[in-house]
Curated annotation (Swiss-Prot):
UniProt-recorded name of the protein: Small ribosomal subunit protein bS16c
Main location: plastid
GO annotation, cellular component aspect: chloroplast; mitochondrion; small ribosomal subunit
PANTHER family reported in the protein's UniProt record: 30S RIBOSOMAL PROTEIN S16 (PTHR12919), SMALL RIBOSOMAL SUBUNIT PROTEIN BS16M (PTHR12919:SF20)
PROSITE patterns: RIBOSOMAL_S16
Any single GO BP term: mitochondrial translation
Presence of the UniProt keyword Transmembrane helix in the record: no
Pfam families documented for this protein: Ribosomal_S16 (PF00886)
Gene name tied to this protein: rps16
Family: Belongs to the bacterial ribosomal protein bS16 family.
Protein source organism: Gossypium barbadense (Sea Island cotton)
Length: 88
């Protein structure tokens, strides 16, 4: 199974996180499949590659709780539901 997870980067006492797509069996700092975003909790900055995130969510990737909150705040799930509705 594949998850959207935070990967810690940065210095001591100055954590920054990358939002990555990674196999669930890999460790936190393990090799990721793709980098899809960036989150800085100190400066409250977020960068998301929304098309890549939507692609992996449609394929069945599960976000962790923290990543889910970040994506919800950015409005990614509203775009996901718009993509999934079919016009007849």
């Amino acid at each position: 199974m594949v998850k959207l997870r935070l990967k810690r980067c940065g210095r001591k006492q100055r954590a920054v996180y990358r939002i990555v797509v990674i196999d669930v069996r890999s460790r936190r700092e393990g090799r990721d499949l793709r980098k899809v975003g960036f989150y800085d909790p100190i400066n409250n900055q977020t960068y998301l590659n929304v098309p890549a995130i939507l692609y992996f969510l449609e394929k069945g990737a599960q976000p962790t709780a923290t990543v889910h909150d970040i994506l919800k705040k950015a409005g990614v799930f509203t775009e996901l539901t718009l993509n999934q509705t079919k016009f007849t």
